[in-house]
């Protein structure tokens, strides 16, 4: 059973998936930094410094106003954190767009390589048609 597991792990697909997950995690950190450190400050500049991740609504409760989402959560209030959700969706859309562009570039490169390969291969000479072969057989049988 251990040998089967080693064989399974050593297969290319499993290794490719592991590398993809590791690179994906690192890529997610880069995109999160892009959004948090570069895009959000620019958006904040146009919206008067509003931090969207801090937008929330307290559900129920005693009417206490909290200064931040962290303070509300720390106090144990039930919150609807719509700002954090919207920022997560925004991060996802940026990641999806970048991945789409990468896949598109890879597909174009593969298509270009396939076209070059097809152009480099000379066309195989056409062999005799079925009719030609049958005529040859007929002629040999006549002799």
Swiss-Prot record:
What domain of life is recorded for the organism? Bacteria
User: Where, per UniProt, does this protein localize?
Assistant: Cell inner membrane
Q: Which UniProt keywords apply?
A: Cell inner membrane, Cell membrane, Ion channel, Ion transport, Membrane, Transmembrane, Transmembrane helix, Transport
Q: What is its main location?
A: membrane
Its GO CC terms? Answer: plasma membrane
Tell me the subunit arrangement. Homopentamer.
Q: What does this protein do?
A: Channel that opens in response to stretch forces in the membrane lipid bilayer. May participate in the regulation of osmotic pressure changes within the cell.
Protein name per the record: Large-conductance mechanosensitive channel
Organism (species):
Ruegeria pomeroyi (strain ATCC 700808 / DSM 15171 / DSS-3) (Silicibacter pomeroyi)
Q: What is the lineage of its organism?
A: Bacteria, Pseudomonadati, Pseudomonadota, Alphaproteobacteria, Rhodobacterales
């Amino acid at each position: 059973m251990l040998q089967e597991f080693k064989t399974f792990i050593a297969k290319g697909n499993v290794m490719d998936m592991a590398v993809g997950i590791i690179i994906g995690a690192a890529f997610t950190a880069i995109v999160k930094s892009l959004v948090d450190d570069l895009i959000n400050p620019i958006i904040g500049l146009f919206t008067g410094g509003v931090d969207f991740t801090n937008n929330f609504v307290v559900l129920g409760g005693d009417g206490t106003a909290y200064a931040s989402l962290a303070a509300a959560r720390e106090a144990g209030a039930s919150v609807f954190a719509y700002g954090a959700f919207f920022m997560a969706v925004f991060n996802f859309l940026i990641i999806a767009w970048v991945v789409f562009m990468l896949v598109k570039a890879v597909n174009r490169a593969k298509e270009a390589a396939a076209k070059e390969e097809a152009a480099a291969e000379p066309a195989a000479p056409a062999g005799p048609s079925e009719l030609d072969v049958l005529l040859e057989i007929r002629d040999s049988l006549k002799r």
